[in-house]
From Swiss-Prot:
Cofactor: Fe(2+)
Disulfide-linked positions: none
Limits of the Fe2OG dioxygenase domain: 181-288
Molecular functions per Gene Ontology: dioxygenase activity; iron ion binding
Biological function: Isopenicillin N synthase; part of the gene cluster that mediates the biosynthesis of penicillin, the world's most important antibiotic. The first step of the pathway is performed by the trimodular NRPS acvA that produces the tripeptide N-[(5S)-5-amino-5-carboxypentanoyl]-L-cysteinyl-D-valine (LLD-ACV or ACV) via condensation of the 3 residues L-2-aminoadipate, L-cysteine and L-valine. The precursor amino acids for penicillin biosynthesis are withdrawn from the vacuolar amino acid pool by the MFS-type transporter penV.
Superkingdom, natural source: Eukaryota
Any matching Pfam family: 2OG-FeII_Oxy
Protein name (record): Isopenicillin N synthase
Record EC number: 1.21.3.1
Length: 331
């Protein structure tokens, strides 16, 4: 059987985005622009984040947490007692039905006295954490990782802004530590023998899937994953495999970027192939603040005019998350 063709996913050295050399930054921006208008994906290399430590700490957490602890941390979709946990917490596997499981946490600055927590603004939650005695150092590591990947994402947003002919802070001015709605999700895809048939979906083309086609609900997504190829991107000739790289971050635009650029930078449609191997998928969904709104424009037109209406990030995120669950089910 012939192997699936590989998608063009370039490796882009993003280190200039942390510096002051505008000529070098523009080289990165041009590479981001080309990737965004091709498959929609690129690998960010020389990103400055210790991904091996991330992988090791995540594996340690996944293999040490008990079923009882998972239940105590479970989001409302699984544990009805946790009415305030819509996004943050543990997403359970379900025997014979669902194999994947994950732990999601939000902005560490969302503490009980945060104004947007106090006002019960939707999509804002206080994180829940496992017992420090049972998982020493995990919370400290996880919160620090949030800010590490936040810093990388800020640099990437500067690159996207330059790629679109805007000022460097065009996106990052809306991406603030005090109120960004970004999330880290530590996803575990386990090896199971036997693997429950009900946990495997089948696409129209016969491909076995773990998660069906979708666009990301984000401005951009910054993903670390194991060295196990699993993602496919839809192109005119069909779905193409994305090669894995466990030293780099896989970056793509979400549907908010597609909306505000009139689809000049589309959100690539992609899916997760079923692979019965132990692996990690650790996305950072780059989300702006609830009240932030980026005015849509069309970069392909000299006057930039578009019929796309402005939408606040909070409204976009609420609607997008609900739509994704309705389409593909609870993750």
């Amino acid at each position: 059987m012939a192997s699936t063709p590989k998608a063009n996913v370039p490796k882009i050295d993003v280190s200039p985005l942390f510096g002051d050399n505008m000529e070098e930054k523009m080289k990165v921006a041009r590479a981001i622009d080309a990737a965004s208008r091709d498959t929609g994906f690129f690998y960010a290399v020389n990103h400055g984040v210790d991904v091996k430590r991330l992988s090791n700490k995540t594996r340690e957490f996944h293999f040490s947490i008990t079923d009882e602890e998972k239940w105590d941390l479970a989001i409302r979709a699984y544990n009805k007692e946790h009415q305030d946990q819509i996004r943050a917490g543990y997403y359970l596997s379900i025997p014979e039905k669902k194999a994947v499981e994950s732990f999601c946490y939000l902005n560490p600055n969302f503490k009980p006295d945060h104004p947007l927590i106090q006002s019960k603004t939707p999509t804002h939650e206080v994180n829940v954490w496992p017992d420090e005695k049972k998982h020493p150092g995990f919370r400290e590591f996880a919160e620090q990782y949030y800010w590490d990947v936040f810093g990388l994402s800020s640099a990437l947003l500067r690159g996207y802004a330059l790629a679109l002919g805007k000022e460097e802070d065009f996106f990052s001015r809306h991406f603030k530590k005090e109120d960004a709605l970004s999330s880290v999700v530590l996803i575990r895809y386990p090896y199971l023998n036997p693997y429950p048939p009900a946990a495997i979906k089948t696409a129209e083309d016969g491909t076995k899937l773990s998660f069906e086609w979708h666009e990301d609900v984000s401005l951009i997504t910054v993903l670390y994953q194991s060295d196990v190829a699993n993602l496919q991107v839809e192109m005119p000739q069909g779905y193409l495999d994305i090669e894995a790289d466990d030293n780099a971050y896989l970056v793509n635009c979400g549907s908010y970027m597609a909306h505000i650029t009139n689809n000049y930078y589309p959100a690539p449609i992609h899916r997760v192939k079923w692979v019965n191997e132990e692996r990690q998928s650790l996305p950072f969904f780059v989300n702006l603040g609830f009240n932030d709104t980026v005015q849509p424009w069309d970069p392909s037109k000299e006057d930039g005019k578009t019929d796309q209406r402005p939408i606040s990030y909070g409204d976009y995120l609420q609607n997008g998350l609900v739509s994704l669950i309705n389409k593909n089910g609870q993750t």
